[in-house]
């Protein structure tokens, strides 16, 4: 077996691989010998079929497997001895297209090698971590929101008109073309005006009604309405308003706290403070992570595999095009050519991706089974009632597992770098933190 270098420019590599006919024949004989003990053929006991007969009967079938295994073996030996790591799947072509049995196998292999990644002195990286304390105003605001969610409704004075935010209790009957339809009727139905829980335009027409009033509400079902027989059709709902109620926020006291699982109001305030500060810390971490990535991008430089940059630039361009053209589904659109800006962003992403992967490998960072299970459970909650199916889907889908593992791995590597960097804390206001987050989102 011979491997001859044909290209070595930057990260581009090319090799000519030759597997001799004798080596291939030996591989075929080896595979036939492995199979011989299990082969049954008329006139012979199991495992006693002569090799010559086996070769005549199964040689052609085994030949293809032997060729593939020989080429794969040559490639694996090359990568082991050279230390090269291909950036993408190597391109392998058979160069003697008129090959026949008894000829040597000649193939060409080309790929882009992953670059050598320089070590980074984490202690030379200076970062700032914003810290925010949950003040009384923020806690009171959160308490007010909780009180609103726990609000009650009480009857307005007789003759009062319903306002946005009020709850009305009504009977209604919906008709399309004069005919009632399934699901279009209810009695004593409570509806909060402005909640947008009904068809667009329905609730607005009930603002101003009084208890005891009857009102016909005319609306048009959306074109994408789930019930196809109603989609896009005009309907008239005959509504009888029985009660008009105003919202009464819950009192902010120990009773409210108990509704939310706290022992008393002081305990609830403590829980809110912890939650707020956890949210602030998460936002501050995102800001510091961006600062870290910017710093790494500035201090580290190495050659990038063109194929990875090209693929990433294409993906960026494709994603941004769809964000600007949300009505276009799938790939039925003109060819999208990445711009210089897309390529520049792709270079940053590829550089940082390779660097973080290298740092993680050297630091032996691993994603544990427990961390993966937690991530799957968190995402499964987005599919109520289908959690088990989602869990099984992920277990059977390696690509999905990798998509979920990648951000966990990245965050663990980032935390590893944080631990070695010079990090100073700076106490700021909630507004300053919010401005920093908004600036981050605008980039």
UniProtKB/Swiss-Prot annotation:
EC number: 5.2.1.8
Keyword Methyltransferase recorded: no
Subcellular location: Cytoplasm
A GO-annotated cellular component: cytoplasm
Segments forming domain PPIase FKBP-type: 165-250
UniProtKB keywords: Cell cycle, Cell division, Chaperone, Cytoplasm, Isomerase, Rotamase
Record text about domains: Consists of 3 domains; the N-terminus binds the ribosome, the middle domain has PPIase activity, while the C-terminus has intrinsic chaperone activity on its own.
Protein function: Involved in protein export. Acts as a chaperone by maintaining the newly synthesized protein in an open conformation. Functions as a peptidyl-prolyl cis-trans isomerase.
Protein name stated in the entry: Trigger factor
Provenance organism: Roseobacter denitrificans (strain ATCC 33942 / OCh 114) (Erythrobacter sp. (strain OCh 114))
């Amino acid at each position: 077996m011979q491997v001859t270098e044909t290209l070595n420019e930057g990260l581009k590599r090319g090799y000519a691989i030759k597997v001799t006919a004798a080596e291939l024949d030996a591989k075929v004989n080896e595979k036939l010998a492995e199979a011989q003990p299990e082969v049954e053929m008329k006139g012979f006991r199991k495992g006693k079929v002569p090799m010559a007969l086996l070769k005549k009967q199964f040689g052609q079938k085994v030949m293809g497997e032997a060729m593939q295994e020989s080429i794969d073996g040559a490639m694996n030996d090359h990568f082991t001895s050279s230390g090269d790591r291909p950036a993408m799947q190597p391109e392998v072509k058979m160069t003697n297209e008129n090959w026949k049995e008894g000829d040597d196998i000649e193939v060409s292999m080309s790929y882009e090698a992953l670059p050598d990644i320089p070590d980074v002195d984490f202690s030379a990286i200076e970062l700032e971590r914003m810290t925010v304390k949950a003040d009384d105003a923020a806690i009171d605001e959160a308490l007010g929101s909780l009180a609103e969610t726990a609000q009650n409704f009480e009857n307005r004075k007789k003759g009062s008109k319903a306002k946005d935010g009020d709850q009305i209790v009504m009977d209604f009957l919906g008709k399309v073309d004069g005919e009632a339809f399934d699901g279009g009727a209810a009695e004593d139905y409570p509806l909060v005006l402005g909640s947008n829980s009904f068809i667009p335009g329905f609730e607005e027409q009930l603002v101003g009604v009084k208890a005891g009033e009857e009102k016909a509400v005319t609306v048009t079902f959306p074109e994408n309405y789930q019930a196809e027989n109603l989609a896009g059709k005009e309907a008239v709902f005959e509504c009888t308003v029985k009660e008009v109620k105003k919202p009464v926020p819950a009192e902010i006291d120990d009773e409210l706290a108990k509704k939310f699982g706290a022992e008393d109001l002081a305990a609830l305030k403590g829980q809110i403070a912890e939650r707020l500060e956890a949210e602030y810390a998460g936002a501050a971490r995102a800001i510091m992570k961006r600062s870290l990535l910017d710093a790494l991008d500035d201090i580290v430089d190495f050659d990038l595999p063109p194929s990875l940059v090209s693929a990433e630039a294409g993906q960026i361009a494709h994603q941004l095009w769809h964000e600007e053209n949300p009505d276009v589904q799938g790939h039925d659109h003109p060819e999208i050519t990445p711009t210089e800006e897309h390529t520049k962003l792709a270079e940053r992403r590829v550089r940082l991706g390779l660097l973080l992967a290298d740092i993680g490998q050297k630091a032996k960072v691993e994603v544990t089974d427990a961390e993966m299970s937690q991530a799957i459970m968190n995402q499964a909650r987005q599919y109520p009632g289908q959690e088990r199916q989602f869990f099984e889907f992920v277990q059977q889908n390696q690509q999905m597992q990798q998509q979920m593992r990648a951000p966990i791995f990245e965050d663990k590597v980032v935390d590893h770098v944080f631990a070695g960097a010079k990090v100073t804390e700076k106490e700021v206001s909630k507004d300053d933190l919010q401005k920093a987050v908004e600036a981050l989102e605008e980039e």
